[in-house]
Structure formats: structure tokens, C-alpha cells
Amino acid sequence: DEVIYQKVGFLSNFTRIYIGKQTPYVLNKIKKNLSQNKSIITYANTWKLIKKNKYYFYQDKKFQIKINTKNIHSMGLLNNLCHAIKIALDLKIEKKIIEKTIPKITFEGRFQYLNKGKIKNSLHKNEKIMLDGAHAEIDAKNLASYLKSIKVPVYGVWAMMKNKEPNLFIKQFKNIFKKVIAIPIE
């Protein structure tokens, strides 16, 4: 409750506020905290992420935009991208510019594969290294979902600060990693 209050309790009045996808519990708390705010508030129920065949699309009442990307591998990040598309459309950015930009978008340190450099060059040609700076339970669920979809042995090198609830985080990866190496953070 305190975190929600800190994030939304001090937002300006008379502006535009966009609220991304939330659990019903968190969404209710956000709505209570914003009940006196005079801003225009847009919630994530004004758009949706849909899947047709093997492709994902942003969709609202006016637009359907194909999410043409090889850089985003998580439902959470796809939802974040849809949220950004909604904001861009509201800012009157043209659909064709958004479509042209989507393939270039990356979330640095989130589901990011190393594609060049000394470490990449030292790997076997069929091996890949992925980095992810996830630190919350929902991030772990998204990462675990993606890792389950790739059909190769997965090894993890993991470090997390105690104040980030590592037990809740790591339990999302049960039966996913062939081996996990834990590194202390000092």
C-alpha cells in the first residue's frame, strides 16, 4: 500500500496520467489514491494485446498495430510496449511512424541476448547468453514463462539483494534451470 501511495499519491493534477496493466488489487488501490486527482486518467482497459496466429497486435477502438519485433520476448514487456503505443497515439504520433519504430525498440537489460563481444565470441555456435535485470516476482513469472518456451537446456547465474524478496523470485524458476549458480551481492 505504501509503495502504491508513493508512486501515484503525488502525481500532478491537471495533466494526463496513464496506468499500465495491474492486478485487480493494485488497480483498486491506485484508483483510490487517484480519486481526488483532477487529471485525465487512462487505464489499460482502453487497449489490449491480442495474438493472431503467431503474431501479436496492439488493438483499441480505432487502431490495430502489428507488433513486429524480434527484441521483445515477454508478455510483460509486450504489455509495456502496448502501453507506450497507446500514449504515442494519444500524442498524435502517426500509426506508420509507430509501426516503423517498433522493430527498433529494445528494453536494455530485459530479456536481452548478447549478440557480440568477447563473451559471445567465446561461446559454442549454438549457445546463447541472455541477460535480465528482473527483480520483482511478476518479472520472474514473465521470464520463467519465456524460458519454458525455449526448448534447450537453461543454466542460470543469479544474484539478488535481500530486500528484493529473492525467495519469491527464485521459486518461479522451479524445474526450469538445469543448474543455477548463485553469486553473492556485497
Describe each region flagged by the PLM.
Residues 45, 133, 185:
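Active-site donor-binding loop signature of nucleotide-sugar glycosyltransferases
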